[in-house]
Amino acid sequence: MKKLLFKLFFALAFTSISLHGQEKIQQVEVHIFEGMALYSSHYTINFLYKEFEAKQVMGEPAELPKKILLLNPPDKWRVFTKKINLNKFKKLRDGPSQQAFDGENEVIIIKTDKKTYRKMNAYSNDHDREVWYDLLQIIAKEFGKKGIYE
């Protein structure tokens, strides 16, 4: 009887530890800053809403700034977060800044219940590039776009 109780206690304790050890994604953000014109766009997705904002700091053409805010139903949020492989994202290595050369910097931020992960231009090798652009594609589809730059 003692052995059975001990095994049951051990199994419950192990299950509790493994369930509490998983991080839950609370918010995903993408920030894109483009070179000398200082154009920036910002995507935010969390369990309450989806938001897109684009602005050009210099020159401000008539079509910018642009802002979209949509409600995000809980069932769609769960489907979205299941598509994201947080472990692969954590392993990405930041790349060098491209903005100084009139390029663009891409920053993805994933906030969990335990920590915030921030990666910039993390596409320096084939594996990182695949993970990076797959994540950008998942985010773009949440906004009904074919790609993040559309």
Summary of predicted features, one role per range:
Residues 4, 13, 33-35, 48, ...:
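Generic structural motif
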Residues 42-45, 64-72, 115-124:
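Short amphipathic beta-strand/extended segments with alternating polar/hydrophobic composition
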Residues 55-90:
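A short-motif feature that recognizes glycine-rich, charge-decorated loops
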Residues 37-43, 64, 102-105:
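Short, surface-exposed coil-to-beta transition loops
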Residues 19-56:
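N-terminal export/targeting and maturation segments
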Residues 49-59, 115-121:
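Short, well-ordered strand-loop elements centered on a beta-strand within folded domains, enriched
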Residues 22-35, 81, 90-150:
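Short, well-ordered, aromatic-rich surface patches in folded extracellular/luminal domains
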Residues 1-25:
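Bacterial Sec-dependent N-terminal signal peptides
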